[in-house]
Amino acid sequence: MPSIVRLSGITVRNLKNVTVEFCPREIVLFTGVSGSGKSSLAFNTIYAAGRKRYITTLPSFFATRIHSLPDPAVKKVEGLSPTVAVKQNFFAQHVHATVGSTTEINSYLALLFSLDGQAYDPITLRPLTLYSKEKILAEIAAIPDGTQLTLLAPLPAGDILRVRECLRQGFTKILIDGEISPIHKFLATGVPVPSQLIIDTLIKNASNTPRLKVSLFTTLDIGHGECCLHFDNQKRVFSTQTTLPETQNTYTPLSPDLFSSHSHKDRCPQCHGSGIFVSINDPSIIQQNLSIEKNCCPFAGSCSILLYKTIYQSLADNLGFSLSTPWQDLSPEIQHIFLYGKEGLSLPVKLFDGTLGKTTQTHKQWKGVLNEIGEKIRFANKPSRYLPKGTSYTECPRCQKTGLSDYANAAKWHGKSFADLQQMSLQELFIFLNQLPPKDPAIEEVIQGLKARLAMLIDLGLPYLSPERSVNTLSGGEQERTALAKHLGAELMGVTYVLDEPSIGLHPQDTYKLMDVIKKLRDQGNTILLVEHDEQMISLADRVIDVGPGAGIFGGEVVFNGTPKEFLANSHSLTAQYLRQEQQIPIPAKRQTSLGSITLSRANKHNLKNLTVSIPLGQLTVVTGVSGSGKSSLINDTLVPCVEEFIEQGSCPNLAVQGKLSRLVHINRDLPGRSQRSISLTYIKAFDELRQLFAEQPRCKPLGLTKSHFSFNTPLGACSECGGLGSITAMDNQDSITCPSCSGKRFLPQVLEIRYKNKTIADILEMTAYEAESFFLDQPSIHNKIQALCTLGLQYLPLGRPLYSLSGGEIQRLKLACELSNPVKHPTLYVLDEPTTGLHTHDVKQLIHVLQSLTDQGHSVVIIEHNMHVVKIADYVLELGPEGGNKGGCLIASCSPEELIHKHTPTSLALRPFLSQHQELPHLPDLRQQPPIPAAIIITNAHHHNLKHIDVSIPRYALTTVTGPSASGKHSLVFDVLHAAGNISYAELFPPYIRQALIKKTPLPSVDKVIGLSPVIAIEKNSAKNSSHSVASALEISDMLEELFTQIGRPYSPVSGDLLKEVSPQTIAEELLENYAQGYVTITIPFPPEEDFFSYTQEMLREGFLKLYANEQLYDLEGPFPDCLESPALVIHHVKILEKNIPSILSSLSLAFSKSSSIRLHIENYGITTSKTYQLGLQDSLGNSFPSNDNTTHLCPFCHGNGSLSTFSILPYKNRFAEHTPLSLFTSLFPNQDPTPIYPLLEELGIPSIALFQEMDDHSFQKLCLGTLQNPGFDALCTKAMLAHPTTNFPTYLISETPCNQCQGNGTYTYEHCTRIHDISLSDIYQSDVPFLKKFLLSLGKDLPLVSDIFQKLELLERVGLSQVILGQEQSSLSDGERYQLLLAKAFSSGLTDVIYLLEDPLAGIHPKDAPSLLSVIKDLVANHNTVVVTDREGSLSKHADHVIHLGPEPGPNGGYLLETSAFRDLQPISQSTYISDQIPKLSVSVLTSAIQIDNLSIPLRSLSTISGVSGSGKTTLLLEGIYKSGCAMLEKDPSLFSEIIFLDSHPQPASSRSDISTYFDIAPSLRNFFSSLTQAKALNISASMFSPNTKQGQCSDCWGLGYQLIDRAFYAMEKRSCPTCGGFRVQPLVQEVVYEGKHFGQLLQSSLNEVAKDFSFLKKVQKPLQTLIANGLGYLPLGQNMSSLSLSEKIAIKITKYLFLPPKHPTLFLLDGVATSLDNQQKYTLLSQLKTLVSLGHTVVIIENHPAFSQYADFLIQMGHKTDKTSSRIIFSGINQSPSLSNKLE
């Protein structure tokens, strides 16, 4: 393990360039006063850094589903492992947030119902069994032999044609009314009643099995999927249909979605999934004589609000009624739809989008106004708040509160419905699961996962909760532990967990249970970071990091970092002083005297046992007790509603008050809005007064500034660039940067001109409460509210700090401060729920002082609390218990704290030390001996694919190689077992939707157990080659560069070349004043063209606008208007252009831009009217506008960010289309396109429309393709047609990608590649390589943080061998080796520790010169305390490994064993090279590009040529751009030298789930024909097509001919299970009756190629492909082996076999790119021998390969390298291999 984790230079929020260190596998306690920076350090720095680094290495489909954090402001991160956060979980307060949903118990149960549940018809309650043909056969097979069976098919009444057809097919009898009758009686009339056609009667025995199958299938065919079986006086009905005949309802199999009330489909149709139903009790609340337009329904949104008016009008248009129709005249159907909605009703609605500045159309699902109210109730903590008078809500009578559909509610699992299991306690559910009999392994895994989750909740003291329990009824402690159980159940090690005050709300008795869980997590090998205030938790910690010394700007420093004992002995921080009792919270010398009492009777909410409780008035009462004992139920759910009723109505039946009580203040755990626009000052209601104070300043009136201008939430005052947020998001990155326009001040410049006491409003928002308190001494109203913040310890808080950035403790005190800032004299009851949440002991002391001051004023305070400091100062204590849940709810103590400690209750034990005169110091043990972490990853009984139940031990923090022949099980062990297990384990830490995304393509591994896992990063060779992203983007270099250019780059116009200037309200106002002073300006915005003119004018009138500009004159907005209005525009302002009017102009411009993206100014100056249009962004001196560099429209509009354009061309392929005419080819390629544009071109060139291409001379054909000045060419017309239908598939050789001329290939808008730093643009960088960028960055200085980060990435690219790759090059254009090296660089760049890296043959195909550098990178990974496991086909890496695992001894079935030594065999040399004479024809190749410059290279034909060279030297470019294109040209001119070009790369052939070896090599048809010729097949009338698992007639209908079933286990990995119906044989049972040599066709498909070749030696047609496959070492493969299930080396070997071992008879040019890299040494030897054989047959082979053996035995050598200046590639050597060594063997 690394000795230390170190983060240095941290400047996040208030942290002052701190450095923090800790050791792995420690429990680190972050402490300090509230607001000191603990959360900023733990979460915003350490967690953010670890998560960002790990997620960027994961597949993009997962990374994009998590909102990745921006990089924290930290200079260096060392030794950090992947991080997982468990934050404070304030669950949504609505009825759908339940214990079951938040802990995923519901998800487990839903999955079990879908996998193993029994479906029932909800009407008839009849069990539903969805049969397949094979399942029906299985049912019949259970009937004893010798039983007479009669099969019948249903026959409908009155169908004469059906009767005649049955008679024609030979059927003679029917069963009608229980009697058998001849069918011919009903030829004329049809059967009078529904009857049954008798298909067959037979005795069940082995000899009749084929007959039974044929008869059954016939019955199902005639009965349209339904069959009736009579036997032994019994009747069974089978159906393959999902429609129940009795009800005509159609059902689908049970799925997890059915059991989620969040699903938009299959919810309860009455309550729409909420489980509640809102009804109208008083019909008079709807005024019958009023219309909807006149607001007849008071509980519906008012039509005076544009939003509701728009929606209601759309509803009226859709249903065909008028909003002005009185309610009583509307039809009952429309009334019902208005109130309760209609399923599937979607309304088109036009609404104004402020972000776009225009009206856009959207669609709204209409649920009905009462259901909308129901939705609000569902999400509300207090439903009564949203319930209108005259209405009520109840549990939905249809779904009984579940919110599920009737079908889901009717389902059963082991006799229990979903609702039954929801109502059990967690303990009862755990016992129920333990009593179940053993299940299928897949189901058992889900049950074990559910039991583990339940056990965790039970261990955390929550056995009494039920899954259906709403979270909003839980106490704070219960909520927190519910959240913890969700995260702490994984068994990973090497993870850094960051926990946010996990002890919040826990009783001291419960805290010890939590500590045991955290210790267990640490002992598994993880690092635990705790942000904590609980003094008990220090005894748990291995290290204490104290952040302070104060809060806010007075904190942000690490004041201590060491062991708890050292902390207690040496630290002078407030935390240590309180622990040493140098500072204390004093016990009151005298308790307050009671001023009366509140007596609450018959309290029975939830688990309360009908309590009667008396609470004294005028005192501070603490309600305490273990978690779940009923405290929240007593106070929040019972006392508070009763007191509210008493105050409102003067009495309450369950409440008796003796004394004075006239007011209630309930401060609960609900969080205020956390919008970026909500700040502390707005919450305490001081911002309005501050704005009014500024609006009253003398300068405001002449400048036209009002109170509204001093708000950053209105367009009048907010900065137009950032919208008043103070920051913007740059270049589509989530990182926010300070707004360059307002410098983070939020306001417009004219607003900031106003000052109060020489301070602007922005200056005041940056003040702390401490500074503001003295500043506003002369403003009592503002001062008192700010003073309340200081009183509660929030003096460090900036007044403008957004609420979303406050900690939990700060939120609690802010809410109390808001109340204290408005003191009242009326006797008030203050009810607080755990107010010490998140507070340091010093802050608790201040809070207690405030609470005591309330009782001093005669008020009463009731607190739910566990903090013993608060309990000890209470005047009166109520304790509930004795335990939680059903064992709680009793009042076990009601007395003073001094009396309580003499009782025997959980709280008394915890309170005694706090009331003792000499409180003991926390017990801190000596330095702990941590349990040893597993030294290895242990894999037990791995039997995936061909692994032979092996047990493997892989040492941690070491380099392990797995060697062996191809297909010996290396990939199965490393990727299919180890990677899958790690992937699934890590996914457990995330919510189901993220987990499903991560493991969707991860099949369940066949292994008993894998222990010692850490997070896994896997890099495989067969990764997709379709990424259009650049090389620079892979390592986020492009993001960093774009941020760098955003910060210090200067934009220039691509048109004029001059520096672009920004267009903003400020620049427009300056331009007006400079050029048009003393004139008049009319500021207008165009009328939205999609808006109704009349409606829009009325809307604008309501907003206060008065004028309209059109026809170059002004009109009143009320009208009248002329018949024709040209370019109507709304007038925002008309004003004289004077210096004093600039603030007014600025405000008007800002308002205009807030309503429209484009504005138009009409300027009158000296009698001349000038009109100008402006858009926000950038502009050059010629008036050309460009989007600003923070605008999302920065993608090039021509290539849409791709950087390249697709072009279509047939010019090089005249001979391929020789027999086509231009029209016939166009219409065949583009059948839906009009060919008319071709005619003018043909007419101009004088080419007849019926002329074939072969009839045209070369000049005419070229003209036709390229076109003329007047008419576009055929290629251009095809390109246009192709772009019109981009999804159409075309031959790839006809399409080429060319760089976009508009953006020079970088995909950005034209001005962006004109943004420059030192005359260098992004475009210049993206067209260059690593050395160029490093030189450029050095010119900027490495002191810039971004520059330093980019340098690290560039150095890694150099180390993996990619220094010469162009940074802007698309990843898809890289060679296979380069792409793999890039993936390695991406994974290595994270800098994480404790990660398991899985690499697939990293040195394969690498040039020997590149290998040492790449090996050093891998070694560095291990040195950084990671575990690296590598597959090594060649064994070249094993000599450098710390541990080697040998698998073998053979490929395929004879492999998969664990060996003691290597299974590699010595290989024999092959024949020498071919003599190349001068007479052998040669292929002349020239490539002259910026990347490679080769002129007149001559490659001999009929020989073997190799191309080798270091990475990035241009090998693939030479092969494709040079040799391939030159070969195509030679093929056109002289086909005699070779008649075909075959190109093969290292990627396997694409294969579907149905493609197998028998179909790929066309072996299956001959075998199917043979089987169909057998006597049994003819007797059963089985044709050849029925022997195919790919036809409907032949395939097993349960698995569709695949032989396996994929079991979708929702948030678990998919399970691939052998089909139980066909036994995995793929073909239907009837086909399996035909047997040859003891095997039916399904068994034949499972036979090896060796066996098939032997058994069918007489079938000459199949022998050649079979013998070729066997010769290539693939004889062990099954004939029906699915192509997609083969290993990479097997796929490549298959590909090689098809194209190289079964070559064309005519001379062919073979171009091979890295095909040998995935082969082991034996396969390389076989390939080399075959290549020599091909040459001897007259073929030509050119192969890219760095393995020395290929160069030794080649006829012609080409060695690639870089020019001395490294600007491009060149040939270092090319020539005949003069003396190849024949004695050397493959290494």
Swiss-Prot record:
Matches recorded under Pfam families: UvrA_DNA-bind, UvrA_inter
Instruction: Mark the C4-type zinc finger spans by residue number.
Output: 719-742, 1596-1622
Residues recorded as binding ATP 3, renumbered to this chain, are G964, P965, S966, A967, S968, G969, K970, H971
- Keywords in alphabetical order, please: ATP-binding, Cytoplasm, DNA damage, DNA excision, DNA repair, DNA-binding, Excision nuclease, Metal-binding, Nucleotide-binding, Repeat, SOS response, Zinc, Zinc-finger
Q: Binding of ATP 1: at which residues?
A: A410, A411, K412, W413, H414, G415, K416, S417
- Which residues span the membrane? none
Residues in ABC transporter domain copies: 300-574, 594-912, 1254-1474
Q: Name one GO biological process term.
A: nucleotide-excision repair
Q: Which InterPro entries does this one have?
A: ABC_transporter-like_ATP-bd, ABC_transporter-like_CS, ATP_grasp_subdomain_1, P-loop_NTPase, UvrA, UvrA_DNA-bd, UvrA_inter
Binding-site residues for ATP 2, renumbered to this chain = G625, V626, S627, G628, S629, G630, K631, S632
rRNA-binding is among the record's keywords: no
Note the subunit structure. Answer: Forms a heterotetramer with UvrB during the search for lesions.
PANTHER family attached to this UniProt entry: UVRABC SYSTEM PROTEIN A
Q: What is its biological role?
A: The UvrABC repair system catalyzes the recognition and processing of DNA lesions. UvrA is an ATPase and a DNA-binding protein. A damage recognition complex composed of 2 UvrA and 2 UvrB subunits scans DNA for abnormalities. When the presence of a lesion has been verified by UvrB, the UvrA molecules dissociate.
- What protein is this chain from? UvrABC system protein A
Lineage start: Bacteria, Pseudomonadati, Chlamydiota, Chlamydiia, Chlamydiales
